[in-house]
């Protein structure tokens, strides 16, 4: 087989998977509570463990990051909850794609719980560099990077940001890197679009399952940038229940 054929195959396979993995049914904008209901029903009614939903979300986000920003190293900001767990998952898939990845975490791996702890331990075992937030952010800057991914706080958080989270977001906003938010920009209320004094300013927001109703509010686009919806792989029947 010629080198030309070999080099063409990965791109062909990825493009084919992009077509195959797009759900045939797209959900309308939803409140954060409705999204939590989808997660709960996927786990309870359809027997999908939360770690599978996180894996699906993380892999889908990593694939889209590869398309949106195919060059450069990646810094992923990981909070203590499931949004951070998504970030740890993304890091592993980007590493598999050959990207240079570093994680800046709000807590040590042994302080995390649940699915986020599992994904953090996998990332750590995979040799991904994980640095707990420290002096670099206190000095008002992040480690040098081309792309910064916001996996700090998810839909359960409400503005205003305080303490170390505010410091990290301010440092990210001061960076010249491409900024990508996971699910929702940290510092934004996903239902109202309300933002505090400090809110992550994304060039792209990769939101899971469905757009959030707050993204449609006046002024929200200044923080979300372009919004992309990532499937979390829930069954079609569940999508049908929430599409009306």
UniProtKB/Swiss-Prot annotation:
Keywords: Isomerase, Metal-binding, NAD, NADP, Nucleotide-binding, Potassium. Its cofactor is K(+). Residues 35-240 form the YjeF N-terminal domain. Its EC number is 5.1.99.6. Signal peptide: none annotated. Binds 1 potassium ion per subunit. One of its GO terms (molecular function) is NAD(P)HX epimerase activity. It comes from the Bacteria. It catalyses: (6R)-NADHX = (6S)-NADHX; (6R)-NADPHX = (6S)-NADPHX. (6S)-NADPHX binds at residues 82-86, 154-160, 165, 183. K(+) binds at residues 83, 150, 186. HAMAP family: NADHX_epimerase. Catalyzes the epimerization of the S- and R-forms of NAD(P)HX, a damaged form of NAD(P)H that is a result of enzymatic or heat-dependent hydration. This is a prerequisite for the S-specific NAD(P)H-hydrate dehydratase to allow the repair of both epimers of NAD(P)HX. Belongs to the NnrE/AIBP family. This is NAD(P)H-hydrate epimerase. The gene is nnrE.
């Amino acid at each position: 087989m010629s080198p030309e054929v070999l080099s063409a195959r990965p791109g062909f396979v990825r493009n084919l998977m992009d077509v195959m993995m797009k759900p045939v049914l797209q959900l309308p904008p939803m409140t954060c509570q409705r999204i939590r209901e989808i997660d709960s029903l996927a786990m309870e009614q359809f027997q999908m463990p939360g770690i599978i939903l996180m894996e699906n979300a993380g892999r889908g986000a990593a694939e889209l990051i590869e398309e949106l920003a195919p060059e450069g190293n990646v810094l992923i900001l990981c909070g203590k909850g499931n949004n951070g767990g998504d970030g740890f998952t993304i890091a592993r898939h980007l590493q598999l794609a050959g990207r240079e990845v570093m994680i800046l975490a709000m807590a040590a791996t042994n302080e995390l719980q649940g699915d986020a702890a599992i994904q953090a331990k996998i990332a750590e075992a995979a040799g991904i560099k994980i640095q707990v937030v420290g002096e670099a952010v206190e000095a008002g800057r992040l480690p040098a990077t081309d792309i910064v991914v916001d996996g700090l706080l998810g839909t359960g958080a409400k503005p205003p940001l305080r303490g170390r989270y505010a410091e990290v977001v301010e440092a990210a906003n001061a960076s010249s890197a491409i900024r990508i938010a996971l699910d929702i920009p940290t510092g934004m209320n996903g239902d109202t679009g309300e933002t505090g004094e400090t809110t992550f300013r994304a060039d792209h927001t990769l939101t899971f399952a469905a757009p959030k109703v707050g993204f449609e509010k006046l002024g929200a686009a200044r923080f979300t940038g372009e919004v992309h919806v990532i499937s979390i792989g829930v069954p079609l029947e569940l999508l049908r229940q929430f599409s009306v």
